[in-house]
């Protein structure tokens, strides 16, 4: 349980989990990873895995979380998924699944020990430093249009901050914007 976290701080858990997983994978595979907002783990332009989190709430407090982590470890083919890859395809090395699991669990423990309402600023900075396409002109699609813009960062609530080439700055919740790459 995360008794120190309220619904206002829910994105803190996402930051901690995605950062822990990427840290563990970097140590194992010795390759660079990035985070495609809000929860995909990439190496280059290829998706290696992702994180899903369901928070259990009591009142305004996060009483617990169900965290799902999916990592493509030793897969060799991804039919119909042009952006998918695996640790094996990136490194050429077959990995022991237990070794990957233990490294992730250890990293999660370290990040969870840091979790509090006050930990978001530091975690957010770390998360933004790994944010895929941050600071680069990219093509996006929302419910209305395709447009060019630049990812500027994330808000404390986990919204993606995009500055359109027109200068307009918009904040998007999960599911409301897609990056075309």
Which residue ranges define each predicted feature?
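Long, positively charged amphipathic alpha-helical accessory segments at protein N-termini or as interdomain linkers
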Residues: 6-8, 12-32, 43-181
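General beta-strand structural signal in soluble alpha/beta enzymes
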Residues: 33-37
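Interfacial segments of multi-pass membrane proteins
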Residues: 1-4
């Amino acid at each position: 349980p995360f008794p120190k976290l309220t619904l206002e701080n829910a994105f803190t858990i996402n930051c901690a989990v995605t950062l822990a997983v990427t840290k563990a994978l970097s140590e194992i595979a010795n390759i660079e990873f990035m985070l495609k907002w809000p929860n995909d783990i990439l190496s280059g332009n290829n998706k290696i895995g992702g994180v899903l989190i369901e928070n259990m709430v009591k009142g305004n407090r996060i009483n617990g979380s169900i965290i799902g982590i999916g990592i493509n470890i030793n897969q060799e083919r991804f039919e119909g998924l042009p952006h998918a890859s695996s640790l094996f395809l990136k490194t050429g090395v077959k990995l022991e699944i237990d070794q990957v699991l233990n490294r992730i669990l250890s990293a999660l423990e370290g990040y969870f020990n840091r979790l509090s309402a006050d930990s978001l600023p530091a975690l957010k900075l770390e998360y933004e430093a790994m944010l895929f396409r941050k600071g680069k002109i990219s093509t996006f699609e929302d419910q209305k249009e395709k447009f060019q813009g630049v990812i500027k960062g994330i808000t404390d609530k986990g919204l993606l901050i995009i500055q359109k080439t027109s200068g307009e700055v918009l904040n998007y919740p999960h599911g409301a914007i897609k990056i075309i790459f």
